[in-house]
Amino acid sequence: MDGKGNETFKYYGQDISYSKVTELVAAGPMLLQNGKNVVAESKNNYKEGKINSSTGQRSAIGITKNGKVILLTAVANVDKLALIMNDLGCIDAMNLDGGASSALFANGKVIKNAGRNLNTVLIFK
């Protein structure tokens, strides 16, 4: 969240001061930033080869220009995931965890079950 309470995504690389951070999710690679597909750039900064190249179950989070948060779980590689998030109207989007960690629950219904027990989850009300 920025200082005005708006959801935001920022790429800080290695240089970040945590003194003013109130909420933080570390994930990657970035998919979209300010409406631009940044997967190619993100792959250079995100060295986990399997995440950069393989197709599998993935989760992503994005924000539209109107501030709407989009959560998605799909079978895709990060290149395809960026295209999907762009098609859904996101201007900023980030790949989250994938594989057996991907799960999605909405409106009290299971949309995609996780393949294992999860230690950490994102919850929006």
Feature locations, PLM:
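Gly/Ser/Thr/Pro-rich low-complexity, intrinsically disordered segments
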Residues: M1-K125
